[in-house]
């Protein structure tokens, strides 16, 4: 049995399709790994790349190089933020202090780099391979440039990883072999993730609900949860219960807007919606939080957006409307 996908939990259909392609030596020019975040698409991509570059039985030394991004014939591209005139990869944004209020993009220059990379002669392997992580984040010009590359496939291999493949051009999707990924069952999630360090064995129910069968999403929700200052979550819940006066509401808006960046604030709204739905199921409150989320996305001054929303909710306007 091949060890290429030993760390992939579940995803039997994806595993079967990828192993068949490797065993038969019939590789498509492009693949689309489609499914929710955090269910193993990147793990599967690494295993597949190892098989493409080293054969069906894999190679441990090559595996380490791929994981470290240290192979001359592999290019891994991810969406970027534009921060002070520089492009910051999504995976480095938090460490770089990027505000992350706007969504990252795959940009035209990145796709041009993909085309050049696939068109060059490989240095070690039989072919060059490129992974486009977050492919649905392509800007329009970038998508059109990628389509031209797909229309003239060479000897290289391209893997697109997408959470929302329907956002890709249909002409791009039609030129890729689809590898579908689904959500994991609870027992499979437990195999992937240990309990949150220093917490009870069970995660807060809202985190599990938001993860919706994705261990990677659960891990991300845990990370955001740990970033929320102590007491803020309880204060948000108390506010809707009517136990917070206007001054306390303004103080809460100040505290969370100063402590959390744009992405973390967006996540906190998402958590708050889920927590309130579990407790009250009042559509008016959820609509108000949807409006707050849109305002935060639209570059409204965050503290002001929070102040207005919290004052309205503390005053009961949205509970009775």
Where are these regions (language model features)?
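Helical "lid/switch" subdomain of P-loop NTPase nucleotide-binding domains
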Residues: 110, 130, 134, 138, ...
